Design a protein with these regions (language model features):
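Nucleotide/pyrophosphate-binding catalytic subdomain
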Residues: 1-157
């Protein structure tokens, strides 16, 4: 398992360097599963944009928005790995079998059914998964009420 944060994949040159490291690990005979964050300050930029277009961004839509940055990263990293002669497959959390509760912005992992990841690695692929953690909330937004999936009022106005 290798984990790369936003700084590690902040630009094309860094993505290529990460791909080189991953490919070297795979070519040494090791199976590789990679977890990667959004590029650079993408998550911060997306949160800022959400608060510019909405006084009360819903938790569900924030989750949807913030996963977009990591989807970009996993796709670009897979492209760079494939360009280096290895097979790579990107996975979202749901594709990887991560099951959570319904609390947007603070979801708890209930179960992991990693069959698709295991199958991909067993077939010789490098599995690349996004890092987005639904529990990572905007620091200024209050958590949703435990019995409600509706978004609370955001204090950033």
């Amino acid at each position: 398992m290798q984990k790369y944060g936003g700084t590690s994949v902040a630009d094309p040159d860094r993505i290529k360097a990460v791909a080189d490291h991953i490919v070297a690990t795979r070519q040494s005979g090791q199976d590789v599963v990679v977890v990667v964050s959004a590029m650079g300050k993408t998550t911060d930029d997306l949160e800022r944009l959400a608060h510019e277009v909405s006084t009360v961004p819903s938790g569900r839509e924030m989750d949807m928005l913030l996963t977009a940055g990591e989807r970009i990263s996993i796709a670009l990293l897979c492209m760079a790995i494939i360009d280096r002669g290895e097979h790579a497959v990107s996975f979202t959390g749901s594709q990887a079998g991560i099951l959570t509760d319904t609390a947007h912005r603070k979801a708890k992992i209930l179960e992991v059914k990693a069959d698709r990841l295991r199958e991909s690695v067993a077939e010789g692929s490098i599995a690349v998964q996004r890092r987005f953690d639904a529990r990572r909330a905007c620091p200024s937004c209050p958590p949703p009420a435990p019995t409600s999936s509706r978004s609370p009022v955001c204090p950033r106005r």
